[in-house]
């Protein structure tokens, strides 16, 4: 009898074909997010779960699913999943590194350009029927001759800097550990203090993971430092930013604009998270938002799902997964 795998969100048909010889599949091939109660009902006798960004696995969940052996996350950031609880229950927690790096960096730059050039308002103007031909309007901010500050210089921050070559911008960054001199010189990067980055950048791009140190790192105190009209772009994690502080900075005219692909309401592991995006923030004209599509490139999503599936297959075969967030004592290393 094949082990049971619960897949909580829609995946490509190719992934179902890959998994079918190894598992009894219980899928969700709709565009609806299953409730926690429904996922629990499906997982009570399951040996494996393929999880996605809206899902949350904690000690209570694992206790209700005693046969679970692996939670294979089709994502990179696993802050909604309790690593210690999985380890204590002997459940592998796996993730997919690296594949989200390039599309997230691309989207960040796209959001920066769109925000600076007022693409949201310009698009609405054309669609309204009011456009009758060229007029001197929608003057914005370009990347050429601008100072771009990147907060965080992990894989995504590096990918942002790499893709900003040739845009004519001056690049600076803040990271607890400085890059090596060769990398700084190759990318034209200058390390500055976090406060200086906020005070001297025309564009501020966030490239941080979410953890106890970074939650609400971008707060009222930091936003009070920005030069008037500066633009803030968040493609990383919603709760890195205090959205209430962002709204206040927008309303007083200090922050020139805010673009985001991620929102505080998505960070399920936070008991105090907002349950929705503030309507006043959504309505503010100097904002540009996308619905967490940083990895929404078909080829990328397919490969993310394939890697998540392969991690699950490895565990169900008695081997170590290729990319694990935790360490368990048993099982042989996987053959990559």
From Swiss-Prot:
Q: Which Gene3D superfamilies match?
A: NAD(P)-binding Rossmann-like Domain (3.40.50.720)
User: Which EC number applies?
Assistant: 1.20.1.1
Cite the binding residues for NAD(+).
155-156, 175, 235-237, 261, 292-295
Q: Name one GO molecular function term.
A: hydroxypyruvate reductase (NADH) activity
Q: Which domain of life is it from?
A: Bacteria
Cite the pH-dependence comment.
Optimum pH is 7.25-7.75.
Q: How does activity depend on temperature?
A: Optimum temperature is 35 degrees Celsius.
Q: Its biological function?
A: Catalyzes phosphite (phosphonate) oxidation.
Q: Which family does it belong to?
A: Belongs to the D-isomer specific 2-hydroxyacid dehydrogenase family.
Note the subunit structure.
Homodimer.
Q: What is this protein called?
A: Phosphonate dehydrogenase
Which classification does the entry list for the species?
Bacteria, Pseudomonadati, Pseudomonadota, Gammaproteobacteria, Pseudomonadales
């Amino acid at each position: 009898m094949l082990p049971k795998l619960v897949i909580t969100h829609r995946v490509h048909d190719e992934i179902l074909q890959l998994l079918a010889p190894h598992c009894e599949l219980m899928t969700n091939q709709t565009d609806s997010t299953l409730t926690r109660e429904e996922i629990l009902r499906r997982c009570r006798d399951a040996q494996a779960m393929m999880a996605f960004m809206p899902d949350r696995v904690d000690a209570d969940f694992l206790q209700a699913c005693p046969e679970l052996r692996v939670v294979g996350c089709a994502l990179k950031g696993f802050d909604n999943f309790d690593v210690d609880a999985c380890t204590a229950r002997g459940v592998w927690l796996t993730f997919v590194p690296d594949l989200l790096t390039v599309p997230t960096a691309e989207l960040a730059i796209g959001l920066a350009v769109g925000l600076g050039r007022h693409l949201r308002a310009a698009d609405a103007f054309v669609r309204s029927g009011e456009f009758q031909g060229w007029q001197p309007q929608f003057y914005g901010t370009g990347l050429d001759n601008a100072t771009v500050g990147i907060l965080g210089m992990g894989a995504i921050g590096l990918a942002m800097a790499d893709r900003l070559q040739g845009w004519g911008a001056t690049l600076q960054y803040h990271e607890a550990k400085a890059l090596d001199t060769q990398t700084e010189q190759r990318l034209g990067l200058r390390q500055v203090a976090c406060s200086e980055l906020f005070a001297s950048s025309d564009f501020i791009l966030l490239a941080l993971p979410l953890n106890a140190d970074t939650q609400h790192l971008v707060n009222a105190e930091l936003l009070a430092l920005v030069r008037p009209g500066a633009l803030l772009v968040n493609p990383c994690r919603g709760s890195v930013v205090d959205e209430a502080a962002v709204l206040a900075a927008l309303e007083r005219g200090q922050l020139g604009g805010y673009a985001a692909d991620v929102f505080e309401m998505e960070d399920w592991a936070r008991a105090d998270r907002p349950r929705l995006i503030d309507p006043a923030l959504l309505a503010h004209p100097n904002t540009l938002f996308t619905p967490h599509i940083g990895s929404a490139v078909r080829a990328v999503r397919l490969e993310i799902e394939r890697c998540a599936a392969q991690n699950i297959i490895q565990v169900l075969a008695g081997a170590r997964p290729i990319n694990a967030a935790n360490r368990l004592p048993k099982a042989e290393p996987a053959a990559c």
